[in-house]
Amino acid sequence: MTKIPPGEPDELFDAADERGFFPEKRTRNSPATAPAPATDTHYHGHRDRLRARYREHGDAALADYEILELILFRLIPRRDTKPIAKALLDRFGTLAAVFGAPLHLLQEVKGVGESVALDLKLVATASHRMLRSELRNKQVLSSWSAVIDYCHAAMAHETKEQFRILFLDKRNTLIADEVQQQGTIDHTPVYPREVVKRALELSATALILVHNHPSGDPTPSRADIDMTKLIAEAAKPLGIALHDHVIIGKDGHVSLKGLRLF
């Protein structure tokens, strides 16, 4: 049996217990077999009822915070996760915004440490991969709603501007999806020559430009419009078409092609 050496500080037991495996803080003098208070396990029946409701009725029977609770059950097995789920939604507003939030902001919510934040981001990554897989081997222009869903999930809640390019072949099938630049809160530097160079490297014959506005408002700026025109002009002589430039906001998107801005 491992014993604590005499004189070891009680702080040995004070390490962060993010996943709640120890319902009470223990010290050297605490009895190892002390029974946990009844309130520490009151949430187990709630978890069973919530799982049963989801099993029988699906997600339509659950509020957003309850869906988040179901996920947190696995991540934090020994703690009441309802307050954490509600705190996350209070902080970020929507389920999508919770999963889209940066790691450091997730960890500012009480009860969420690095491990739980990473696991929440893993759920978001799985969702993004699933949406992106819907674009594979499909004609992108005929799957436009899938393109928007994917781009919105991947970019709408980024806190900095991100410039992404979808490279297409002559059948308008997706060849590559690449983030070209990461900028500041309101600006991303884009170099038309580099965009065209990368298209030639991939043997792409068409492009869709996508970037986000962290402010949430997808209205294009004059700089957005001018940059789009420059890329279209650089690509056209090389037989590369610019199909669209889409700006993603938190609650919607704008198509520059749809607005006839280039």
From Swiss-Prot:
GO molecular function: metal ion binding; metallopeptidase activity
The UniProt record lists the keyword rRNA processing: no
Chain spans, region Disordered: 23-44
Pfam families: RadC
Entries under InterPro entries matching the protein: MPN, RadC_JAB, RuvA_2-like, UPF0758, UPF0758_CS
Keywords: Hydrolase, Metal-binding, Metalloprotease, Protease, Zinc
CDD domains: MPN_DUF2466
Biased composition (Low complexity): 31-40
Record has Hydrolase as a keyword: yes
Motif (JAMM motif): 211-224
Signal peptide location: none
Residues that coordinate or bind Zn(2+): H211, H213, D224
MPN domain boundaries: 140-262
GO biological process, one term: proteolysis
Family as reported in the entry's similarity comment: Belongs to the UPF0758 family.
Alphabetized PANTHER family for the sequence: DNA REPAIR PROTEIN RADC, UPF0758 PROTEIN YEES-RELATED
Record protein name field: UPF0758 protein R01728
Organism: Rhizobium meliloti (strain 1021)
